Amino acid sequence: ALGELKRLIPENSTISSFFLYDGTLELGLAKYNRTVVAHTNKQVVYEFWQALKLHHRYLASIIEFMFERLTIPELYLLQDNWHQYKDLEERAAFFYILSHCSDSGYASHGNLDKSRLCPVKINSLKRHKSKNFYPFWDQFEKPLDGLMTAKNTDFLLFPVGKFGYNFFEYGKNTGHDMVSIDHK
């Protein structure tokens, strides 16, 4: 997908991306000379990316320290309350650890396996560069309400990822890091 987007979106373009979560496409485009404003309406997702952007080495050291000590039962307990921790760096670290250990890719739900997060991934955070990448917290309940904040942009990007489109979406449990999309 990144290769195709690089082909379609010229260098030095400005992109407003919505539904920021794992940042794969956004960071890839930013690395290849596109300015990316990555929107999310989830405060905990924004906090992770902002913490990574501002002090990646410190955040990586917290993640490394916690990951070595946390057990699987403790991680399952954290899935329910990680977003309630007062310390921003702790929340950001839990977000990263849980989302990388989860088979769903979400911090707030999924089956957990510590082998999904290898030390190489954590070490790569220490060398993280986020030039041309700007996380933006749209403080709206609905994620697409943030479209009105996308100013002076050449392209809009909607990497919605996996989603279920069925009659049983209403009432489905979602975590503080998960976006619910109304497909009606």
Where are each of the predicted segments found?
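Short charge-dense sequence patches
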Residues: A1-L2, K86
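Short, acidic/turn-prone active-site loops that include or flank metal/cofactor-
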Residues: N41-V45, K162, H183
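Conserved beta-strand scaffold positions in the cores of enzyme catalytic domains, especially
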Residues: V36, P135, M178-S180
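SAM-dependent methyltransferase catalytic-core segment centered on the flexible catalytic loop
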Residues: F168-K184
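Short, conserved loop/helix-junction motifs that constitute active-site signature segments
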Residues: L29, T149-K151, K184
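Aromatic-residue hotspot detector
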Residues: F19-L20, E26, D103, G161, ...
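SAM-dependent nucleic-acid methyltransferase catalytic core
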Residues: L8-E11, H56-K172
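SAM cofactor-binding core of SAM-dependent methyltransferases
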Residues: L2-E4, L8-D80
